């Protein structure tokens, strides 16, 4: 049955194949996540992969409330912002959930940012307190001192800093009585900045409750998880994909969340085997490492039943390789964007009652939401199988960009549609295929060349372990596609061999004109290729 309707404006709107469900949007995020805690209060909630310490659901809920009281004691009030500058750790969870109980906002920053980047975000978000680790204190010390901010450390606190235990030892009954509105902001991630400057994305209690429910609630949940599951949390929690689809979804269903501080293939496999991990939310770089590393074969990974990856091209051969490594897993993709809360589409093979899916699709629009595909030039909605800009509407999308109404208006139109800047199409089976970023298309004499398509081809070559394609200026064509390629271990593949491999498979204007061999392809924490860095290298004339 086709899930599409036409509106009075002539818009063709696509919906999930799953029926809409009741979503308790009135609940604050913490109340929603812990709503069914009585069913699993003594079960493991967080497992710290670094030291094997296990926190039960009762521990996590109580500690989060203690942290809320502790933050309040330090002067943090409702609608204030705290900055969490941490790698994955139980304290990250306690800080985020604690702020929610208080009606405060968490802005999450990558601890590997430069001091200037951290300070920029702390300033822009008006953070009133910073939670970090001793090794990162130097990045914020001067700013915190100049602005009279408390810095809290989760490990040995240097002079002038407060130890995290001061928060966890507070009396949970001291949380002030706050009335949280569903439209209040709870999380303030900064969008990746792959286009323009990073901006604070205001995600509300209602938005995140809706997004989690769209994934894991309902009789036939789109992303089926339960309290017997063990989720691998290796993606950084400061990124919304991990925060939402791993932490918040995991808490909602009562699953055990196994926290890994950073990806290391050996430790990763050891933890999967030891704790019998069942669900693996990954990004393409991790999928690539799993598929191409011989180490993986030494471990029993048969417990994994779900492997989901972000919507970047994996390529058919890569998918097949992952299937061999995880013999019992369903492999599929989701599609997200920070501003959309972040999940727009989710693979229906992950549903409790699964659907058949096609290789390369990145899911079907989530339930309780609407999607349309529009012509980027005219704004008119397009029928099935025609690529255009993906737009989404629903309660899960951001409230807007912090202090940037102009950027908000450019992104969310008057009808409430969020314009993603991604190009894709919906096929006859309601599956979404991403063609590319609107802003990343290469224009060869007016022909559109999608980098993602060429990258998928390159990744299928056995002697290529990673690749990125970007435009290079060309006098005659305007732009031509060039590739940055990482050779597989021991390979001595040449530029001509790479070019020939691609040219046999594509139309003339998609042929790669130059190949630059590099050690690594630069990527954001969420796994997106940092194309602007590669373009800058080309412009500077130093491609390698």
Swiss-Prot record:
InterPro entries on file: AMP-bd_C, AMP-bd_C_sf, AMP-binding_CS, AMP-dep_synth/lig_dom, ANL_N_sf
Cytoplasm recorded as keyword: yes
Tissue note: Mostly expressed in flower organs, with highest levels in corollas, and, to a lesser extent, in tubes, sepals, pistils, stamen and ovaries. Also present at low levels in leaves.
Annotated Gene Ontology cellular component terms: cytosol
Function of the protein: Catalyzes the formation of CoA esters of trans-cinnamic acid, 4-coumaric acid, ferulic acid, benzoic acid and caffeic acid.
Location of this chain's protein in the cell: Cytoplasm, Cytosol
PANTHER family per the UniProt record, alphabetical: 4-COUMARATE--COA LIGASE 1 (PTHR24096:SF402), LONG-CHAIN-FATTY-ACID--COA LIGASE (PTHR24096)
Top-tier EC class: ligase
Organism: Petunia hybrida (Petunia)
Pathway recorded for this protein: Phenylpropanoid metabolism; trans-cinnamate biosynthesis; Phytoalexin biosynthesis; 3,4',5-trihydroxystilbene biosynthesis; 3,4',5-trihydroxystilbene from trans-4-coumarate: step 1/2
Domain of life, per lineage: Eukaryota
Name under which the protein is recorded: 4-coumarate:CoA ligase 1
An example molecular function term from Gene Ontology annotations: ATP binding
EC number(s) stated in the UniProt entry for this protein: 6.2.1.12, 6.2.1.-, 6.2.1.25
Induction profile: Circadian-regulation with peak levels occurring late afternoon (e.g. 3 to 7 pm).
GO biological process: cinnamic acid biosynthetic process; cinnamic acid metabolic process; circadian rhythm; ferulate metabolic process; phenylpropanoid metabolic process; phytoalexin biosynthetic process
Knockout mutant characteristics: Normal benzenoid scent profile in flowers.
Catalytic activity annotation: (E)-4-coumarate + ATP + CoA = (E)-4-coumaroyl-CoA + AMP + diphosphate; (E)-caffeate + ATP + CoA = (E)-caffeoyl-CoA + AMP + diphosphate; benzoate + ATP + CoA = benzoyl-CoA + AMP + diphosphate; (E)-cinnamate + ATP + CoA = (E)-cinnamoyl-CoA + AMP + diphosphate
Main location: cytoplasm
Keywords: ATP-binding, Cytoplasm, Ligase, Nucleotide-binding, Phenylpropanoid metabolism
pH dependence: Optimum pH is 8.5 with cinnamic acid as a substrate.
Subunit architecture: Monomer.
């Amino acid at each position: 049955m086709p899930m599409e309707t036409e509106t009075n404006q002539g818009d063709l709107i696509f919906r999930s194949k799953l029926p809409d469900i009741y979503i308790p949007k009135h609940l604050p995020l913490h109340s929603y996540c812990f709503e069914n805690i009585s069913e699993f209060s003594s079960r493991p909630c967080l497992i710290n992969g670094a030291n094997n310490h296990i926190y039960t659901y009762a521990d996590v809920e109580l500690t989060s409330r203690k942290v809320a009281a502790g933050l309040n004691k330090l002067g943090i009030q409702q609608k204030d912002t705290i900055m969490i500058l941490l790698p994955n750790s139980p304290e990250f969870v306690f800080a985020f959930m604690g702020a929610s109980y208080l009606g405060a906002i968490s802005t999450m920053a990558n601890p590997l940012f430069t001091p200037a980047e951290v300070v920029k975000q702390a300033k822009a978000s008006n953070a009133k307190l910073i939670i970090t680790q001793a090794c990162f204190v130097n990045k914020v010390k001067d700013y915190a001192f100049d602005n009279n901010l408390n810095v809290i450390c989760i490990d040995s606190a240097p002079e002038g800093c407060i130890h995290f235990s001061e928060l966890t030892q507070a009396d949970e009954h001291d949380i002030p009585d706050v009335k949280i509105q569903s439209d209040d902001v709870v999380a303030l991630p900064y969008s990746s900045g792959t286009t323009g400057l990073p901006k604070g994305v205001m995600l509300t209690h209602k938005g995140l409750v809706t997004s989690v429910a769209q994934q894991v609630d309902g009789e036939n949940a789109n992303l089926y998880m339960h309290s017997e599951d063990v989720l691998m949390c290796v993606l950084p929690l400061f990124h919304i994909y991990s925060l939402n689809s791993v932490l918040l979804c995991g808490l909602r269903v009562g699953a055990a969340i196994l926290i890994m501080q950073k990806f290391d293939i050996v430790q990763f496999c050891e933890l999967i085997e030891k704790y019998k991990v069942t669900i693996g939310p990954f990004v393409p770089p991790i999928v690539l490492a799993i598929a191409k590393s011989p180490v993986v074969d030494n471990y029993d990974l048969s417990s994994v039943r779900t492997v989901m990856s972000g919507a970047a091209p994996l390529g058919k051969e890569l998918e097949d390789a992952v299937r061999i490594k995880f013999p019992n897993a369903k492999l599929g993709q989701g599609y997200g964007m920070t501003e959309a809360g972040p999940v727009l589409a989710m693979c229906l093979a992950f549903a409790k009652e699964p659907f058949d899916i096609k290789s390369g699709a990145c899911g079907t629009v989530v339930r309780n939401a609407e999607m349309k595909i529009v012509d980027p030039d005219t704004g008119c909605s397009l029928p099935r199988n025609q690529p255009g800009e993906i737009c989404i509407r629903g309660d899960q999308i951001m409230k807007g960009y912090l202090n940037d109404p102009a950027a908000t208006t450019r992104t969310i139109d008057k009808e409430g549609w969020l314009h993603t800047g991604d190009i894709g199409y919906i096929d006859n089976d309601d599956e979404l295929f991403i063609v590319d970023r609107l802003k990343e298309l290469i224009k060869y004499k007016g022909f559109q060349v999608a980098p993602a398509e060429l990258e998928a081809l390159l990744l299928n070559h056995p002697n290529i372990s990673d690749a990125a394609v970007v435009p290079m200026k060309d006098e005659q064509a305007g732009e031509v596609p060039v590739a940055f390629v990482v050779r597989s271990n021991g390979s001595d593949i040449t530029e001509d061999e790479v070019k020939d491999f691609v040219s046999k498979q594509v139309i003339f204007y998609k042929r790669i004109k130059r190949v630059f061999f590099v050690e690594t392809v630069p990527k954001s924490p969420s796994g997106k290729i940092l194309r602007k860095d590669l373009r800058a290298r080309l412009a500077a004339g130093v491609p390698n």
